[in-house]
């Protein structure tokens, strides 16, 4: 296209080298490889265990550049001044070329918007953390978890013993839970307790005097939103792809897995309710640990091996870990 446009071979080659250099060394890693026509900065590695970290976006990015290339190739045909071997419907070629360019830009726009949405949502979750950072909070003394997972849906029941170790009364109890997990009920004994939800924060309408303890049950169900993980790490730094040692491919990043084949959950994804936030985006090193006695019972493993910290014990209907 450049050559047919400029009609100068040397200048065309020079411009193409400059364009390739800009894409390769400057724009290749912008927006996680969106402007990389060669795909060198994309997660190309495929794991037999975890699969591909983002196959849909990967294919859309590659299709984006394929369509853009086809569009410019069509325009080059129209601008190439020579007698054709057979009659060419220039209008049809123009429509196809422009359509390819438009579709390519649309595919690229979708990839860009998805990445932009991830960053915006992470900023929203970080603002929520900062909003409630200075609120007085209780401490979870013990947490008894009953978890069942089917497909990409996680069902949990958490019995929390929360104590107010502050010198002042708590007007409400602050809890944290993954935003994709929907809380169906919070009960103190057999009594339902009112609560409000703001992203990953749960505000339980229960006063707690200094030194007072309360036990209530949180029932929840849903998926895992990985965008709430590691909010204390800069977005570009967190999603910067690293090459696999001894291999030309790069590996993508995932922070949780929930599926039929295997499930991997870490405390950072907030798959169970906690009273102290695991991160502090405003001051990453100012994080207070919450020392809690945990008991985890996993039901309906479907033959899969369950691995968790604590003492393992097989019980009727599931496997229990205490620690």
Residue ranges and their predicted role:
Residues 141-145, 156-160, 173, 216-218, ...:
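Hydrophobic residues positioned within well-ordered beta-strands of beta-sheet architectures
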Residues 169-170, 178-239:
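A surface-exposed beta-strand-loop module
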